[in-house]
């Protein structure tokens, strides 16, 4: 058991090191692009804006500031709080809000490149016989489908669109393709707004609180049978 713990810790360090190296390399490349395009040295604020974008695009928001402190504290309750907040930031484009025009153009260009790459993946998937869900009322929005296989090519970002649409617009699309209301006359055995919000939060809980709820409910977040003994596996 001790050896297994050492191996897991080493693998975690190796993963973090490689990911941080990739972040550094991308940051240096984007800084070089700004300096080459603008023919001047990059400013500190521009460097910070690019750093924010690089962190957000790779699943982090940083550990400094009020948001970072809150994210670290919430890790005891929510699974990978930094990742979840970074998905929201990528969706809203927050790294461009206070950026200089030069940094904003660069970051916007990166968004366009990412969308182009994702579009190419979706195109290939469709050519290979897959389906792509484009209805924002569906929980599978943005995903490629190959039978029972789902590929989340947008890295978890569209789930927040689906949640907002279901809550605000008041409709959802089931796995069978039916459009049903989430407010008012909700069909039997279907989720209303309160249940949708609760289930979404349940799906974002850390293993211990999430497993505790699953043990009391008798099933996990995807509806599979779950007992207290399953938490010990």
Predicted region positions:
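Amphipathic interfacial helices
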Residues: 1-233
